[in-house]
């Protein structure tokens, strides 16, 4: 019982021995319950089929994603302006879709985020390092770090590990005393500032929409729809992109995360706007 000590058993050697045995016994093995894989997916068989010695393929997983960000000014006094950051949610390992619900917009500060493109582990780890540095800077200096300084620290850190196999293609976007800013950073230590940027295997498709519809001044609704539409087109033309569209709107005063939008629903909404019937009707 709780509160008892070995002195309570000094008159009974048998009970004392049993108490000691109970205290030094190995703990019971934890019983973890994991979610079952979807029907039809057998990872072991998949690996043997695609990457065994007889398959003729090397184990070099191709990565795929689509991330974008752009700066815009408010078109009316009722709009807030700022930065739109939009991403898909698919994580792929070559031909294998490993996840459909990855959050690729990672928080760095109150009004600053970083996106993920490349290796998920590399992006998540180094983004956490940058977020920790930004927090320590703000505690030490008693002021918020700028987007430029955060991205410079990110690029310098990655430059120190260039040539060692890292796979990082990130955008650091945020609002500071200099206004809205977007910096593109990669695993080679490159860093550049852009007003409109897209990174990932589906970036060419996203750029096609952004180049045609982006305007320096837009309403908040127009900007959000542009981000959603660019991601939607990328997911339908790039096999490495898919899932849902996660969108973040960074304004001068706050960071707004919108609910995830299914790209399939976005595709049908876009078709309705064009008056196009995309329903599959097989000819008998």
Swiss-Prot record:
Location of the protein in the cell: Cytoplasm; Nucleus
Pfam families: Proteasome
This protein's record includes keyword Glycoprotein: no
EC number, UniProt record: 3.4.25.1
Primary localisation category: cytoplasm
Active site: 65
Protein name as it appears in the record: Proteasome subunit pbs-5
Phenotype when the gene is knocked out: No visible phenotype. Constitutive skn-1-dependent expression of the proteasomal subunit rpt-3. Double knockout with ddi-1, sel-1, sel-9, png-1 or skn-1a results in failed expression of the proteasomal subunit rpt-3.
UniProt keywords, alphabetically: Cytoplasm, Hydrolase, Nucleus, Protease, Proteasome, Threonine protease, Zymogen
Assembly, per entry: The 26S proteasome consists of a 20S proteasome core and two 19S regulatory subunits. The 20S proteasome core is composed of 28 subunits that are arranged in four stacked rings, resulting in a barrel-shaped structure. The two end rings are each formed by seven alpha subunits, and the two central rings are each formed by seven beta subunits. The catalytic chamber with the active sites is on the inside of the barrel.
Encoding gene per record: pbs-5
InterPro entries hit by this protein: Ntn_hydrolases_N (IPR029055), Pept_T1A_subB (IPR000243), Proteasome_sua/b (IPR001353), Proteasome_suB-type (IPR023333)
A GO MF label: threonine-type endopeptidase activity
Catalyzed reaction equations: Cleavage of peptide bonds with very broad specificity
One term under GO cellular component: nucleus
Propeptide segments, given as residue ranges: 1-64
EC class: hydrolase
Example of a GO biological process term: proteasome-mediated ubiquitin-dependent protein catabolic process
UniProt superkingdom: Eukaryota
Family: Belongs to the peptidase T1B family.
Chain's role: Component of the 20S core proteasome complex involved in the proteolytic degradation of most intracellular proteins. This complex plays numerous essential roles within the cell by associating with different regulatory particles. Associated with two 19S regulatory particles, forms the 26S proteasome and thus participates in the ATP-dependent degradation of ubiquitinated proteins.
